[in-house]
C-alpha cells in the first residue's frame, strides 16, 4: 500500500512537467505563426526559442513576445529563430490572445531583459512544471 501511495505522489509531482525535445525531433514553427523578426539583420543578433514536449497547456499555443509585441505563436516541440537589432531587448511569453478558446483566457506574462550584440546568439526554452507553471529559461550549453 505504501508503494502505491509513493507512486501516486511521484506521478502527481512529475505528471505535468515537460521535457526537452531531442534536437532531431524539434519542428520549426510554421510560417503562418511567425509574426515578426524574421528578416536577417546585418548588425543584429539572433534569439532562438524552443518549447518543451508535454506539460500543462500542451494543447495551447504560447505567445513569444519580443519588446512586448507578439513575435510568434509556438506549440509544443517547436522552435523559432528571431533576428533582432542590437541593444536591450525584452523577451517574454504570454497567453496567445489570438486563440478564442479557453487557451486564450488564462494569465501568463513573464519577461526578461536581454542584451543583444552584433552576431550574438541566445537560446531559450519554454518549460512547465507543477511548481513554477509555464516559464522560460536560457539554454545551458
Regions found by a protein language model. Name each.
Residues 1-18:
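Sec-dependent bacterial lipoprotein signal peptides
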Residues 16-141:
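Short loop/turn and low-complexity linker motifs enriched in small/turn-promoting residues
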Amino acid at each position: 500500500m505504501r508503494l502505491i501511495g509513493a507512486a501516486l505522489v511521484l506521478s502527481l509531482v512529475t505528471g505535468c512537467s515537460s521535457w526537452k525535445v531531442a534536437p532531431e525531433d524539434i519542428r520549426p514553427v510554421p510560417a503562418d505563426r511567425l509574426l515578426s523578426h524574421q528578416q536577417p539583420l546585418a548588425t543584429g543578433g539572433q534569439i532562438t526559442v524552443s518549447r518543451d514536449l508535454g506539460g500543462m497547456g500542451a494543447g495551447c499555443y504560447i505567445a513569444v513576445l519580443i519588446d512586448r509585441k507578439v513575435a510568434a505563436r509556438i506549440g509544443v516541440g517547436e522552435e523559432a529563430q528571431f533576428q533582432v537589432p542590437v541593444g536591450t531587448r525584452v523577451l517574454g511569453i504570454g497567453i496567445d490572445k489570438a486563440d478564442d478558446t479557453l487557451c486564450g483566457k488564462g494569465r501568463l506574462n513573464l519577461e526578461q531583459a536581454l542584451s543583444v550584440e552584433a552576431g550574438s546568439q541566445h537560446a531559450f526554452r519554454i518549460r512547465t512544471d507543477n511548481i513554477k507553471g509555464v516559464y522560460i529559461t536560457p539554454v545551458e550549453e
